[in-house]
């Protein structure tokens, strides 16, 4: 299978919209698109799945072992004719030490790069910008550009003339279009499941990409993908794991679910927002992250969900929550307006969005004991909640940031119930 990376000089350049339009346009031509997302982001993959019709794997060169990156590519190759990978941030932006950039991923997987350039405030300077990106690393090939937010025919002509001077192919030109802007909130884009006209948006993006880009040239730029054998992932929480899944609990990595199934575990889903109970046969329940703060009142009134979670925990099932799921396992959640909502009360924890503080970055976590996990792991943390109070319970992890700074202990465990703000990704070497 061949692959491409859709990257940009910076965030906000329009690469998500271009990626969605490209996936849908190529899918309409009969191609089987394998979607991918660089980095730890949960939100973009749901849009990719909507555009491509296929599950989207994350590829994170900082947090994932090289063998897992190659294994994810192999899994994608089994069910796709071309991999379309969306980068994160700028092409060469990574963790604090510079590692883990999309460029590292392009080099590791052999992906040609198409650079999406926001040209709203550029003309001839585009050549210096693109030329610098093309020459920055010998092991990363910028195959061409898509010029986004171009204002007029005259503007397009200046841009094309400038890029002709450095022999950089222009695969497409997209004019400024207010209808091609996705709504955002504090953790990124508004989720795909909450976008009231998502299909219409993707169809419009596909129409603009198909009419403004040379799709044959885009496909011709794709390069053979470097793949590997299957790699081990984090162990499943249980033999039969019930996973919360709705707009309040949507942040769950596809490589983990796929890895759990590959290890023989059964995965079922339920919706706390619909007041559903986890599978009563489950020996583990997983509450992933999401936006419980936006649905706190509804969750506090979900009596069937609450009773079933207490029954599962009381019956010995391993219950684990990450970030938003961790907050729901606590006793209460204080919303941004100061109103408090009662949560499950399975952990002695009260969290608040009334006192906001951003927590963001890669983490290396080591379990304090082996009740839930063994060995060091990589993780990512991104939230605005603060801990108002914390009662007596065992700590779950010791934590270091990407630079190795000791962040102390984090998370809580009370018998067979545990959680933390960290989104676990892979084993740490």
From Swiss-Prot:
Pathway(s) it belongs to: Cofactor biosynthesis; adenosylcobalamin biosynthesis; cob(II)yrinate a,c-diamide from precorrin-2 (aerobic route): step 9/10
Domain GATase cobBQ-type positions: 240-429
GO molecular function: ATP binding; cobyrinic acid a,c-diamide synthase activity; hydrogenobyrinic acid a,c-diamide synthase (glutamine-hydrolysing) activity
Annotated site residues (Increases nucleophilicity of active site Cys) in this chain: 423
EC number(s) stated in the UniProt entry for this protein: 6.3.5.9
InterPro entries cross-referenced by the UniProt entry: CbiA/CobB_synth, Class_I_gatase-like, CobQ/CobB/MinD/ParA_Nub-bd_dom, GATase_3, P-loop_NTPase
Reactions catalysed: hydrogenobyrinate + 2 L-glutamine + 2 ATP + 2 H2O = hydrogenobyrinate a,c-diamide + 2 L-glutamate + 2 ADP + 2 phosphate + 2 H(+)
TM annotation in the entry: none
Keywords: ATP-binding, Cobalamin biosynthesis, Glutamine amidotransferase, Ligase, Magnesium, Nucleotide-binding
This protein's domain notes: Comprises of two domains. The C-terminal domain contains the binding site for glutamine and catalyzes the hydrolysis of this substrate to glutamate and ammonia. The N-terminal domain is anticipated to bind ATP and hydrogenobyrinate and catalyzes the ultimate synthesis of the diamide product. The ammonia produced via the glutaminase domain is probably translocated to the adjacent domain via a molecular tunnel, where it reacts with an activated intermediate.
Identification of the protein by name: Hydrogenobyrinate a,c-diamide synthase
Organism encoding this protein: Rhizobium meliloti (strain 1021)
Lineage: Bacteria, Pseudomonadati, Pseudomonadota, Alphaproteobacteria, Hyphomicrobiales
Gene: cobB
